[in-house]
A protein has these predicted regions:
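Short beta-strand elements at the ligand-binding edges of bilobed clamshell
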Residues: 151-153, 160-182, 196, 223, ...
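Bacterial signal peptide processing site
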Residues: 30-33
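Segments of small-molecule ligand-sensing domains
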Residues: 319-393, 403-404
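Beta-alpha junction/loop-to-helix N-cap segments that form part of ligand/metal-binding clefts
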Residues: 82-83, 94-160
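Periplasmic-binding protein-like
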Residues: 121-133, 153-155, 191-196, 244-259, ...
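C-terminal motif of bacterial Sec signal peptides marking the signal peptidase cleavage site
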Residues: 25-28
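Extracellular/periplasmic periplasmic-binding protein-like sensory domains
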Residues: 247, 259-331, 344-345, 395, ...
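An alpha-beta-alpha
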Residues: 168-225
Length: 404
């Protein structure tokens, strides 16, 4: 069945041949230990040293694309990997006349598996590698792909593994931070404090926070870090309290596993969200966070959920299960590959085409790849209001001039 959502937006972007639309949705699984979809710092460690399994093919088109996923990794890795695989299959089935064959390889969640799977896919004629998911696996796959002069479109949100020819199609937390600080600054917030988790994710968002505040000529008045126990949270709030009267906003990117307890510590410490605006990231896009009293009225940035919800409905119907939150990434990657194969001829996966400044329209909104491999996304700003999540500033439909 040909679906109209692939066609309408192709007419709407500035570079029509390069636009592809993928209508996606939201589920409840994160791709890494941080709780941020797709943010990872390592691999699950299954099957060390084993080669990738030969896997199967999806589709029968002339253009071959490798799909490297942790299908039999330990724990959540396999759950996410199989959801990504299903989404890739769905994208191919829904794209009208897709001329692709996906060469599916199981990397078992290891760098060794990713290296072997990439080598196998390239031997079988892959022009593009989609995946892997985990950062160490991306590095291993990239090394092989680079020697064959083939690009990689990976799902890690660890910006350290992005480089020329290795494009991250993911949800980088830096994008969330930049968007919400930019919005707060535009609303007149000039001084910022931060209370960040003492984790790998916390380090990434703290650095992004400092950069975003500096870029807007604003002031950072204090930064405190907390670990997961209640005593650490209370101590961090206590250290922060003397600086809060100087702050217009408090950046507190805590996820559902810690935000309720941290919110209680903030309340007990006298924090008033009507005087200091709470700010967060996409980890706030969770009902358990939305109900925390201490951050009501707070703003955070996240992909618009309408596209994901549409995708999730179709996925549920097709596979009789809910997709993980990161499943949209594989759907968009395969839809994009199919669109470029149709419209761009022999240049379909060239650097110039993949880093097109107008970007692409996907399930989670508009995005584009930078020459350094990182991505920029059009994100919405949402507000926690009476325990609900409401949009206060819609995601842009156009990304504007490139930042790099």
């Amino acid at each position: 069945v040909l679906r109209p959502w692939h066609l309408a937006p192709i007419l709407s972007l500035r570079t029509p041949a390069l636009a592809v639309f993928a209508s996606l949705a939201l589920a409840a699984c994160s791709g890494g230990p941080s709780g941020m979809p797709g943010f990872d710092t390592g691999s699950p460690g299954a099957g060390q040293g084993q080669p990738a399994s030969t896997g199967q093919t999806i589709g029968n088109g002339k253009v071959k694309v490798g799909l490297i996923l942790p299908l039999t990794a330990e724990g959540q890795g396999a759950v996410v990997g199989n959801s990504l695989r299903n989404a890739a299959e769905m994208a191919l089935a829904e794209f009208p006349g897709a001329d692709l064959t996906l060469l599916v390889k199981d990397d078992r969640g290891t760098p060794e598996g990713a290296q072997a799977g990439t080598q196998e896919a390239l031997r079988e004629g892959a022009e593009l590698i989609i995946g892997p998911l985990f950062a160490p696996s991306v590095q291993a796959a990239a090394q092989v792909a680079r020697s064959a002069n083939r690009p990689v479109m990976a799902f890690s949100s660890d910006s350290n593994v992005a480089t020329r020819g290795v494009y991250l199609l993911s949800f980088p937390p830096e994008n969330d931070v930049n968007r919400v600080i930019g919005y707060a600054s535009a609303q007149g917030k000039k001084s910022f404090a931060a209370l960040v988790p003492d984790t790998a994710y916390g380090k990434v968002v703290e650095a992004a926070f400092q950069q975003a505040v500096a870029d807007r000529g604003a002031r950072t008045v204090a930064i405190e870090r907390f670990s997961g126990d209640a005593n650490s949270m209370r101590a961090a709030v206590g250290r922060l309290a003397p600086s809060l009267p100087q702050a217009d906003a408090l950046f507190v990117p805590a996820a559902a596993d810690t935000m309720p307890a941290l919110g209680l510590a903030l309340q007990q410490g006298g924090f008033d969200p009507t005087k200091v605006k709470p700010l967060g990231t996409g980890v706030w896009n969770d009902g358990a966070v939305a109900r925390v009293p201490a951050i009501q009225g707070g703003w955070f940035a996240s992909p618009d959920t309408a596209g994901f919800n549409a995708f999730a409905g179709r996925y549920q119907q097709r596979f009789n299960s809910a997709p993980t939150r990161t499943a949209t990434l594989a759907y968009d990657a395969v839809s994009l590959a199919a669109a470029l194969a149709r419209t761009q001829g022999s240049q379909r996966f060239s650097e110039a085409v993949l880093t097109n400044a107008s970007g692409f329209a996907g399930a989670d909104g508009v995005f584009r790849f930078r020459p350094d491999g990182q991505n920029e996304r059009g994100l919405a700003v949402l507000e926690l209001r009476n325990g609900q999540i409401v949009t206060v500033n819609a995601a842009p439909r156009d990304l504007g001039p490139k930042t790099q």
